[in-house]
Amino acid sequence: MKTVLHLLNTNTYSGAENVAITVVRAMKKLYPDYRLVYVSPDGPIRERLNSEGVEFEPIEKISRKEVRRVIKKYHPALIHAHDFTASIVSAYSTLRVPVISHIHNNTPWLKRFCINSVVYGLSTLRYKKVLGVSPSVFDEFIFGRFIRRKSEVIGNPIDLERIRDAAESAEDKRGYDIVFLGRLNEAKNPLMFLEIIAELKKRRELKAVMIGDGEMRAEVEAKILELGLGDTVELLGFVSNPHGILASSKVLLMTSSWEGYGLVAAEALALGKPVVATPVGGIPTIINGGEGVLVSEVPEFVGALESLLTDEDKYCEASRLAVKRAEKIDNLGEYAEKINRFYSGE
């Protein structure tokens, strides 16, 4: 049996973690000769991994010492490292074990000549393969032209059955008009979300929810008070299974400054929810019709949301198209086949 370590730098559940768990589950089901171990710092992610039946090896932090300890324990045939930190540490921890670097977002420093881009660029010499969730990951990487032979756009695994089962089994099924689902960080631009809600509140009553945690939580809490949104926006923090709330709500609002793929948009479509989002990263490959709206400015967001929330016929049509679009991007079997090809060295 071939052991593959999925290495991540975070201890909570969000986009990259979702992808890693989906890959592990799919590979276990379709290619049972693999032993797949999820390796990350311990924390809230443990509960999610237990519920998904994913083998977990907790580490103190991402470091060469800890990665080498885990390698010695499991003797892996391959390390599948998710995002930049895990990839770089893996590259400099072992010369013996092949590493696949899987990049889930196109952070702004990718475009610049800086210490981060140089360190990651040098680390790519060690990778067996570099996977990106959208073309923008490689198009915007300042050293992207040097890794063309080993880079491949793979998108994200979309498992409609798993998404819908998660929504059905969720304990929390409270419904809201508008949902923010993601980390509270610069990439997801949560302050813009609040500005949009404040403007929309001037036109109609509504209830919004923010699901997720992160380094901007204090700023978000302060902004909610500043804009007088205490009775309008509920800040839930990390929720281990947010799909029940998403399924019971009306619209997903994504205000991201940058994205890799935008997996939560696909999850919303799977649950029949229209998406209003910024046209960044892979989002335009997911939302390309009446199932959602792509806009960039606060007034445009407000107009699109007001239209969906007040026009029942328009909302129902967008919901129908969301389900239809989700069926087209359901790709779990095809995705697992690609991963198996990479693991097998083909």
Residue ranges and their predicted role:
Residues 6-62:
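N-terminal strand-loop element at the rim of the active site
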Residues 14-25, 180-204, 210, 215-221, ...:
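A conserved mid-protein helix/loop that constitutes part of the nucleotide-sugar donor-binding site
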Residues 15, 313-344:
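A charged, aromatic-enriched C-terminal amphipathic alpha-helix characteristic of glycosyltransferases
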Residues 38, 274-277:
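Short hydrophobic beta-strand element within catalytic cores of glycosyltransferases
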Residues 81-87, 103:
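Short His-centered aromatic/hydrophobic patch
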Residues 136, 157:
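Carbohydrate-associated surface elements
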Residues 238, 257:
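Aromatic "clamp/platform" in nucleotide-sugar-dependent glycosyltransferases that forms part
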Residues 289-299, 307-312:
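Conserved acidic donor-binding segment of nucleotide-sugar-dependent glycosyltransferases
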